[in-house]
Amino acid sequence: FCTFSRLLSPPFRVNMVTTKGVRVSGGHLCEAEAPTEATAETKPENRYFTEENIMNAKTERQIENLKKQTIGVEIEMNHITRERAAKLAADHFGTGRYEYTASRNGYSTWSAWDAQGREWKFQKDVSIAGCDAEKCELVTPILKYEDIETLQELVRKLRKAGAISHAGIGAGVHIHIGANGHTPQTLRNLANLMASHERLIADALKIDQGRMNRYCRTVNPQFIEQLNRKKPTNMAQFADIWYTANGANYGRNQHYNDSRYHMLNFHATFTKGTIEFRLFQFDKPTAEKKNGLHAGQLKSYIQLCLALSEMAKGLRTASPKPQQTENPKFAMRTWLIRLGLVGEEFSTARNFLTKNLDGDAAFRFGR
């Protein structure tokens, strides 16, 4: 039976005891197999566990591996010029190096360089509301997990400088995870994971319906059906299914191929070698939290994408069947455990990804 260092509240309700661990409705707390008969001490109503103290060798490997993946982030904002944002970044990096690079990058780009010589771009994105001079999209270089803190610090400085980002101005957040290590099967797993959870994620993030209708649509049912029926064994076959099912078989190498406008964008996989998650946005500003930009929220989004990518690599298969809907908060919390987002390091992510959902996080069917 699994052992835990301590029990914390709020509790998690166990609904199956096994020889190797416990299983929770909607997700596994520990690696589980061979169900055993529950005793008086191990009956579901008598055993409660929490995500903070759930850690085994499998989860530790999961967390270790998710941190090895590469990251790219795009943050759309306004109320700050691209030149000013680039100067702020250059000062933040301590290099003082920033310049106008539109002749090379297009999009009226201003670039800043960090101490490692990496180029951080601030580009014009016409989909953002506001005057043209202040339509600004931050495009990071390829980052590693340990660079997240640097990105967070930059986001805080941009916010303090007046930059604003939220769905009300047409601004979103796109996160790229390096596709290295993925196969047609693991990408199929990822597509099914998104198909089965994207409604839950959309509710958790309160994704703007206008963005969902245009720029971050849900997974195309025809794509999922063809993907699971044909079971591609190479990337060329996978690409054929992606583009044809999405009605975008033209211009596969074009940046603005229409297939890209999905929460999960595999067009980036075939053109950039990344998996793009386009669904994120910052909360609408309030009196307490101005300008929308939030470093903790951004880190939570990155961690979720890393965990999704890593889980897809570790599964033999995944189902596109939607999750239970009678208790969304419980469904999300147990899923985050399966993703490996346990312990203090991921507590902020768990909070951001469950706080907007209805239901009881500890009891699937109520107390």
Segments from the language model and where they lie:
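Short, Lys/Arg-enriched N-terminal segments with co-localized hydrophobic residues
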Residues: P35-I54
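Residue-identity detector for glycine
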Residues: G21, G26-G27
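Short, conserved phosphate-binding/catalytic loop or strand-edge motifs used
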Residues: I169-I177
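Leucine-biased recognition of intrinsically disordered, low-complexity hydrophobic segments
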Residues: L7-L8, L29
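Short, positively charged and aromatic/hydrophobic N-terminal segments
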Residues: T3, L7, V14-T18, E45-E51
